């Protein structure tokens, strides 16, 4: 089974489009396992008070809780790009995903900063260790596909990559 790393940020509309294209293509590739790699589209220094990303930190909480990450990702992309959930309000974010995660528990975890280091480690893994230039980006079997700045990845490019990289 091939492992596909998908690098993305929930606040990136091109990532949302790439995510949905990936979901459509996965049905034709049951031999591909997706490893989600959330990372900030514009990483800020850790000391910056706005350096936290609730969607990404919530991802690590959801992963720890064993939540279906396809459901979580779909919901958070919708919240960030369509419903425009306040990306800096812990309680509003937790309320938005309350049918997936306990809002009180999630709010406490987000406020505590428990997953902030994982967020920064994910950024380092994407940009420093894997040479991601633009997101969404894909890595599989030593092959890579990065988005084109301001355009993203087309469904055709994604489908071609999945076939060639296996």
Model-derived segments and their meaning:
Residues 1, 55, 134-135:
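A structure-centric signal for secondary-structure junctions around beta-strands
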Residues 2, 51-53, 112, 154:
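Generic serine detector
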Residues 10, 16-96:
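Structural alpha/beta surface segment adjacent to cysteine/selenocysteine redox centers
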Residues 19-30, 94-166:
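C-terminal cap of thioredoxin/glutaredoxin-like
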Residues 4-5, 69, 74, 85, ...:
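Generic intrinsically disordered, low-complexity segments enriched for polar/acidic and small residues
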Residues 1-13:
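Short active-site neighborhood of thiol/selenol oxidoreductases, capturing the structured segment around
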């Amino acid at each position: 089974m091939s492992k596909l790393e998908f690098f993305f940020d929930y606040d990136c509309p091109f990532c949302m489009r790439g995510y949905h294209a990936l979901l459509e293509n996965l049905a034709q590739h049951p031999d591909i396992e997706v490893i989600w790699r959330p990372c900030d589209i514009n990483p800020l220094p850790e000391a910056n008070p706005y350096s936290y990303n609730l969607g990404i930190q919530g991802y690590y909480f959801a992963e720890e809780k064993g939540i279906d990450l396809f459901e979580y990702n779909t919901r958070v992309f919708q919240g960030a790009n369509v419903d425009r959930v306040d990306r800096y309000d812990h309680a509003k974010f937790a309320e938005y995903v309350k049918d997936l995660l306990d809002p009180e528990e999630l709010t406490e975890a987000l406020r505590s900063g428990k997953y902030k280091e994982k967020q920064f480690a994910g950024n380092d893994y994407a940009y420093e260790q894997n040479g991601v230039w633009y997101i969404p980006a894909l890595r599989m079997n030593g092959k890579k596909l990065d988005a084109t700045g301001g355009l993203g990845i087309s469904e055709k490019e994604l489908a071609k990559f999945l076939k060639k990289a296996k």
